[in-house]
Amino acid sequence: MAITPFQRLTSNTTNVFLGANMAQAAMNAANNAGTNPDVVARFPEWPSLQKFENDTSLQTFSPYGNVPNPDYIWDQPSSEGQTVAFAIDSSTFGNPSDFSIFLVAFADNAMEAKIELFEFIGSTFVKAAPQPAGLDEFLLVAGDPNMPTEGITETTPFNWQDIRVYSTVFTSPPNPDNTRRFKIVLSFEVTNYLPTANNPNNPNPAGLQFMIDIYRNVL
């Protein structure tokens, strides 16, 4: 079998869901429940994740050319020290497959991310157990998300202004009678740092932008 495009997921205000934490956001996304984030304007100091201008559905081979560029998203209104959890799910699949996943993300300010497999059990998608090797409990960390109210402040040059990149591979579980159904769920937890101590009146925006490309080889 050949490696084929499966799906591109991007930050937006329709398919991304909020939660009190990453686990709840992931459950909400997997089951299309809860509330969606707000779009926020790009702040001047933020980079922007964008496709090439000619990467469109009109090209001979552009598997994700019809997917719009990602939005900057947040749970408005933003506040100092605020932490917001987001998640998005893939389409449902059943056939055992080898998957390749490529993630690129930026957040103001600190973020954690996790990629998990969910399975439809009874009437609900829940986190699959055990998780396939390559997903498991690996938590991606950028910045220091856990201490904003203890004094982490934005200082120049801002040490959080990096675009983060990650990739992984995994094999989905066996499905001999074709009754099992799965989803890939990407979740984030993003923290807005406190304003710079010597410039307390400066604006303190918050936002998340991401793309995740998924390819697979059906076994």
Where are these regions (language model features)?
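Beta-strand-rich recognition domains
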Residues: 1-115, 140-219
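Short, surface-exposed beta-strand/strand-loop-strand elements in extracellular ectodomains
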Residues: 110-132
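Local beta-strand/beta-hairpin segments that build beta-sheet-rich folds
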Residues: 126-146
